């Protein structure tokens, strides 16, 4: 597995506590700013909609794999992990090794947030978080973020913003967005 060193680029991730927070807007603003500053960058949105490796995640988000409460967080994370690993190996790794900024809309932090939310036991939750980090960064060899920008806003405001939009990259009201208690 490759190790992070000073000769590689940076990985910057924009995350949010729930969908509809304005991540895409902030992503575009940061992207524009980095470009104006002359930084070479590559950007990617996860899940990778419209790709063969993002398709299982899209099916999950549409509810075609069952209700999240009945699915193992480890299984669900595996869908996302494969998407991230293929995108990393096909598109992102080489750019990162060339010193470019990799700007990501969602990444591993999303699995840590969404899948661990369904785990009630604190020790099991910690074990899951450790598992995701080891599995994805060490075993699968994807790049570890240098910076994660985490957006937070009041739930009522986020709900209003989310309800005002038509779809989430072609997935109208995904399984998490339909579950208000989960989103809280």
Positions of predicted regions on the chain:
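Walker A (P-loop) phosphate-binding motif
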Residues: 2-32
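Hydrophobic "anchor" residues on beta-strands that sit immediately upstream
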Residues: 11, 15, 101, 142, ...
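Generic detector of well-ordered alpha-helical packing
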Residues: 16-20, 106-107, 147, 153
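Flexible, glycine-rich phosphate/dinucleotide-binding loops
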Residues: 20, 50-52, 157
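Short, surface-exposed alpha-helical segments at coil->helix boundaries
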Residues: 24-28, 54-55, 184
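Residues in and immediately flanking transmembrane alpha helices
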Residues: 28-32, 36, 118-119, 165
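ATP-dependent small-molecule kinase phosphotransfer cores
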Residues: 36-140
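A glycine- and Lys/Arg-enriched "phosphate-lid" helix/loop adjacent to the NTP-binding pocket
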Residues: 110-184
